[in-house]
Amino acid sequence: MATPHINAEMGAFADVVLMPGDPLRAKYIAETFLEDVVQVCDVRNMFGYTGTYKGRKISVMGHGMGIPSCSIYATELIKDFGVKKIIRVGSCGAVNEDIKVRDVVIGMGACTDSKVNRIRFKGHDFAAIADYKMVRAAEDAAKARGIDVKVGNLFSAELFYTPDPEMFDVMDKYGIVGVEMEAAGIYGVAAEYGAKALTICTVSDHIKTGEQTTSDERQTTFNDMMLIALDSVLLGDAE
């Protein structure tokens, strides 16, 4: 049965969903990496697809920008469509000189300046963390392909155009591996509804140096991240 934001039928989604922010990246992932692909939803042009990867049923759907948007889609997928695992595959900015543009980072946790998890957790701080086995599977998948990844804390920002750029120095000091806008929200939703989640990001720009990729590159060239996510699903099944 369709929800207010996802016009799919029950059973349309696999138990694992890859979620990029950009719905056109969802389309790219489905058309590039999956077989027997069927588009299952398109409300607000937030496209969702289901297909198979090496015989394994997997879905992919966009989640938009920011914690409020991704939380809506993650909640409905888990609560209404029975999704068990969400893997966000997105872009992030780097603040550390040892992390370069196009590096892949795995978010084992996510700090945030958003209050959504405090609202969810009765005013207390909630440690927004990824599922350990999903983190391990992603790291193992990367090693199997010879892809170097950085594993650490992300920072999920409430604002893209921040009025406090000095915060980037604080993030660097605390070892933040990437700045994005969704992981903490997705981890909170997963915890609330008893699901599992992971965020894998490709560094699209470096906040300190100004180096950046184009919007077209962000949409269609971050293939290492996609392959790590897909392979990690198969490794998770094998446990």
Curated annotation (Swiss-Prot):
Catalysed transformations (reactions): a purine D-ribonucleoside + phosphate = a purine nucleobase + alpha-D-ribose 1-phosphate; a purine 2'-deoxy-D-ribonucleoside + phosphate = a purine nucleobase + 2-deoxy-alpha-D-ribose 1-phosphate
Segment forming the signal sequence: none
Binding site for phosphate: 21, 25, 44, 88-91
Enzyme Commission code: 2.4.2.1
Residues holding a purine D-ribonucleoside: 5, 180-182, 204-205
Pfam families: PNP_UDP_1
Top-level taxon in the UniProt lineage: Bacteria
Cellular component GO terms held in the UniProt record: cytosol
Cited function: Catalyzes the reversible phosphorolytic breakdown of the N-glycosidic bond in the beta-(deoxy)ribonucleoside molecules, with the formation of the corresponding free purine bases and pentose-1-phosphate.
Protein name: Purine nucleoside phosphorylase DeoD-type 1
Species, as recorded: Vibrio parahaemolyticus serotype O3:K6 (strain RIMD 2210633)
Organismal lineage: Bacteria, Pseudomonadati, Pseudomonadota, Gammaproteobacteria, Vibrionales
Gene: deoD1
